[in-house]
């Protein structure tokens, strides 16, 4: 919002921008202030594939992602006793991913088998540096932080996390109508403490393509596709900070004396948030798939919910990440799509879509027992 009166001169007699007062900023100063961000990103990938023997293939692939961001803010002083300031920050990040899979394919008459073993490593690192200063001798040297009479702050940061995964998958198909899939994976994340780092997640699925059965062949002009499926699987989440399991220390000053203080409260018994989902469904198609859709029922159970839980203020902290409880939701889904008009020769189509779903969520368990207390605690520790 501009609050400069229109009768105020924009420039002084010597041609410089008119400095009015603390309460009235000449918009020409705002135009000369600089606030910009610059960024560069690079992604590179290299892969190798080796057919060891017929049906057995080894694949390895490495990916590197690099990003750099720089933010600059230069503010000129806009009144006689004002203070100019500058802030510069820079951040670099790297993500390394190395994936390896060994795949085996085998077909024997009516039997089809696909097996896969895999190993993956993903590592993320970021480095940051920022500095700010104020009270420059001249606005033309705002880009040189060394010329600031007051060095406001200098800060650096480093973040990293690593995820190591092993996994296996087995797919079996018989006569293109009976299908089975089984998977297992183990994930180890540096976001958890040494004793809770690994999570284990199995899953399985069965399917029966009923429309391929002989007793429906005479009705294929009506029932073009019919598939019954069921599955159960467990997945994990590591949606938390890189160092949530560790109590971190930060810098502080007291009476101009340097010191350190706890900056965040860690929890070394944090573990993977897990979700078990069960589902049964039917996929259908009628009259050459002119009418098609699916209907399904599912249940999901989430255990060891990760949540930033409030703690008493007397602890000097506001919250700590914890596994606080479990959720359960269940429901059904139904959808249908109808091709009312389907004339490919004249490029004329008219579709009708309809879907309905119902979901019920229940909080089954809550471990949080935090109580709020007034007041606070000093967080300065003199060394």
Model-identified regions with their sequence ranges:
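Charged, amphipathic alpha-helical segments characteristic of ABC-type P-loop ATPases involved
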Residues: 11-14
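Extracellular/periplasmic, surface-exposed regions of secreted and cell-surface proteins
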Residues: 1, 16-75, 84-383
């Amino acid at each position: 919002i501009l609050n400069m009166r229109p009768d105020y001169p924009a420039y002084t007699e010597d041609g410089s921008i008119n400095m009015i007062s603390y309460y009235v900023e000449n918009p020409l100063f705002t135009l000369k202030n600089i606030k910009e961000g610059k960024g560069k990103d690079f992604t590179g990938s290299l892969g190798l594939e080796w057919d060891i023997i017929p049906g057995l293939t080894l694949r390895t692939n490495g990916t590197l992602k690099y990003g750099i961001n720089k933010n600059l803010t230069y503010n000129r002083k806009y009144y006689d006793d004002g203070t100019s300031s500058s802030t510069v920050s820079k951040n670099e990040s790297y993500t390394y991913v190395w994936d390896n899979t060994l795949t085996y394919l085998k077909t024997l008459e009516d039997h089809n088998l696909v097996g896969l073993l895999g190993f993956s490593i993903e590592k993320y690192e970021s480095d940051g540096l920022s500095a700010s200063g104020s009270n420059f001798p001249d606005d033309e040297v705002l880009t040189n932080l060394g010329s600031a009479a007051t060095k406001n702050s200098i800060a650096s940061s480093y973040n990293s996390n690593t995820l190591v995964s092993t996994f296996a998958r087995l797919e079996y198909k018989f006569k293109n109508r009976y299908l089975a899939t089984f998977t297992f994976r183990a994930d180890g994340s540096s976001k958890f403490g040494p004793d809770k780092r690994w999570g284990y997640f199995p899953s399985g699925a069965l399917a029966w393509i009923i429309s391929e059965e002989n007793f429906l062949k005479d009705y294929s002009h009506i029932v073009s596709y019919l598939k019954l499926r069921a599955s159960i699987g467990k997945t994990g989440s590591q949606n938390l900070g890189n160092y949530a399991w560790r109590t971190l220390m930060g810098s502080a000053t007291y009476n101009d004396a340097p010191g350190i203080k706890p900056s965040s409260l860690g929890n070394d018994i944090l573990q993977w948030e897990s979700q078990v989902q069960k589902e049964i469904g039917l996929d259908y198609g009628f009259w050459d798939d002119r009418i098609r859709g699916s209907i399904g029922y599912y249940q999901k159970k989430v255990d060891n919910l990760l949540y930033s839980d409030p703690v008493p203020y007397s602890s000097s902290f506001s919250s700590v990440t914890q596994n606080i409880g479990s959720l359960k939701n269940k429901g059904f889904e139904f959808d249908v799509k109808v091709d009312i008009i389907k004339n490919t020769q004249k490029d004329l189509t008219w579709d009708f879509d309809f879907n309905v779903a119902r979901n019920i969520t229940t909080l089954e368990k809550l471990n949080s027992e935090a109580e709020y207390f007034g007041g606070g605690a000093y967080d300065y520790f003199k060394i």
